[in-house]
Amino acid sequence: MNCYLILTVALLLTSAMTGTTTAGQLNTKGVTLREDDRTFPCSSGLCACLPLDSYSYICLSPSSSTANCENDECISEDDW
C-alpha cells in the first residue's frame, strides 16, 4: 500500500476523531473557514443573507425578499 495513502487516511481519521476541520469546511456559523466572518461578504450597497438551506451567505439587494433568509433578515454592512 502506498505510504501517501496511509498518511492521508491517518490524517483524515485524526481530524474526524478530534473534531477539527480543514480549510473550506464549515464552522458553526455557516461561514466557511476560508471566509473571515469579520469581513462583510458582499459588495457595498448589498446585504448578506444566510439561506435556510445553505451554509454560505448570498448577497441581495436591500429591497429583496428575506423570506428564505435565516431569521428572515438580510444583514447590511453597517450591521455586520
Curated annotation (Swiss-Prot):
Disulfide-bonded cysteines: C42-C59, C47-C69, C49-C74
Keywords: Disulfide bond, Neurotoxin, Secreted, Signal, Toxin
Residue positions assigned to the propeptide: 24-37
Keyword Iron: no
The organism's place on the tree of life at top rank: Eukaryota
Comment, domains: The cysteine framework is IX (C-C-C-C-C-C).
Protein name: Conotoxin Cl9.5
Native source species: Californiconus californicus
